[in-house]
């Protein structure tokens, strides 16, 4: 790539040099011819010699004419830019060249030669940079669409029979930033102008205690600016963020949920109140648990004798089931006692014990 650029550059400069030499030779020949005519006319009369010499001086001074103009041009990204050459009389044009120097790229050349009606390009690979129309009609340059990478210098040089004319453009590509406005949990407002070129400026309405920071530049030349604003104890409900930029101004508004930041004593109250409530609940549960355990212990102590009596009942039942003769003997004795009582009452009853 560097070799190609050097070769193209040398070719273009060689063309220009040839035209300059040809122009100078032409001017020299005209001067010599005029001088000879002047010498012949000098013999015929002094007045004619003075007139011819003055005409030659005017011609030579016109050939050495040199004009240069510099212009700074700002163009919005993704639009069309047309760069024009210096206004000159077209019949006198010999060569038109464009030199393009972009950021981090080698120079690019484009040329048009009028006598042969030919165009050449050297090291120009960007197809978005072209002639605006036919170079034999209008040698203006066109960039469509404009990208961030088109930042740089564009120079049009026209070589004419009357002299050289330069017009240099310093092209700056503008990128509008993306503007956002939000409210944080701390009661502050944050306005951000992201990925703008060049850096944007941020202002607030109403004014407050604001802190504006500019981030680092990205590889494409864009930068982000962020402003954080707070209003302290002032009762502010609505705020506006205004972003000023060469690509256009923008303003956003937001309604704050709280006009001022929460005081310190209220913050402490909001923190300690939940903790205090949790302690009360935990303490109440602990007290209820202790009182419940005490009641359980008292109930167990009161029911202890009953439990012992109940524990004896299975043994008694076991004795009864395993000693049926003991039960019959008791029934016989009971029957005899009842019989004696009946006899005492003069009642005769026949009792038959059950076997």
From Swiss-Prot:
The chain crosses the membrane at residues 268-288. PROSITE patterns: IG_LIKE (PS50835). The keyword Transmembrane applies. Gene3D superfamilies: Immunoglobulins (2.60.40.10). Residues 27-267 are extracellular. GO terms for cellular component: external side of plasma membrane. Disulfide bonds join 85-156, 108-124, 191-241, 210-229. SUPFAM superfamilies: Immunoglobulin. Glycans are attached at residues 46, 123, 153. Residues 139-257 form the Ig-like C2-type domain. Residues 289-355 are cytoplasmic. Residues 35-56 are annotated as: Disordered. GO terms for biological process: regulation of neuroinflammatory response. Keywords: Cell membrane, Disulfide bond, Glycoprotein, Membrane, Receptor, Signal, Transmembrane, Transmembrane helix. It is a single-pass type I membrane protein. Its main location: membrane. It holds the Pfam family V-set. SMART domains: IG. Residues 35-55 have a biased composition (Polar residues). Residues 1-26 form the signal peptide. Inhibitory receptor for the CD200/OX2 cell surface glycoprotein. Limits inflammation by inhibiting the expression of pro-inflammatory molecules including TNF-alpha, interferons, and inducible nitric oxide synthase (iNOS) in response to selected stimuli. CD200 and CD200R1 interact via their respective N-terminal Ig-like domains. This is Cell surface glycoprotein CD200 receptor 1. It comes from Bos taurus.
